[in-house]
Amino acid sequence: MKICFLDGIKIPYTSKDINSNKIRGAENILINLSSEFANLNHDVTIYNNCDNDEVINNVTWKNINSINDKPYYDLAISNNDIRLLDNVISSNKVAISHSIQSLEKFFRKKQFISYLKNKPKIVTLGNYHDKNRNYLIKIFGSFKINWAVDQIFIDTEIKLNNNSCNAIFTSHSDRNLDLLIDIWKKYIFPKNINKKLYITPYNKSLEQFNIHNRKFEDKKNLLNDLSNSRVLLIPGHK
């Protein structure tokens, strides 16, 4: 099969950046999915804002601005932006959704017309996204895939420091960091002032609560931070 992925994110990246701190989960998914398709001997092309056209591990990377004459693919997959599917011809179009998108946001992001035009199936990530996404944004079909783990986390053995009193938060601050900080200040820190919470960069100084900023670093450094922590805290949805 001829398969293409389309990603409009402005950050230039390829699969060489899989362990870099400049990409997020959405880009990781694209890299890993494309790699698995290539391993199954499919002809895979990724259109994004990469600096140079190149072939890496049997996956062709092309700058998205180079698309012309609407090339044909057996399967076209958009990474979060349905409008990108306007640029290719395919009888099988798919859009990966990385969030629970309201109808209001769907219209505001100018996705609706392209959605009706391309009629893509929507890929949701896990039961929560599948259950809570508006059914009108799944009228052409949907299916879910579960979150996976990057190979570096499978291959690396973490030696836990059981004497550590550190907790760590590794997501971006828009992933309910405010909620976590509030819980820490009210319920955790008062019980033990020696416990430390390391978070992604925050716009306020919170060291009086033993909350410390940590940099967004590559995955090798992240593994080191995890090994020096007792618990990884991930606040749920409000």
Named regions from a protein language model:
Residues 45-120, 127-128:
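Extended catalytic core of nucleotide-activated donor transferases of GT-like folds
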Residues 3, 43-44, 93-94, 142, ...:
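Hydrophobic anchor at the start of a short beta-strand
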Residues 227-238:
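Acidic donor-binding loop of glycosyltransferase active sites
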Residues 7, 46-48, 77, 146, ...:
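Short beta-strand segments
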Residues 5-11, 97-100, 147, 199-204, ...:
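Short loop/turn segments at strand-loop or loop-helix junctions that form parts
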Residues 104-106, 118-143, 149:
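A short, active-site helix/loop in glycosyltransferases that binds the activated sugar's phosphate group
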Residues 1-48:
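N-terminal subdomain of nucleotide-sugar transferases
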Residues 151-223:
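Conserved catalytic-core segment of nucleotide-activated headgroup transferases in glycan assembly
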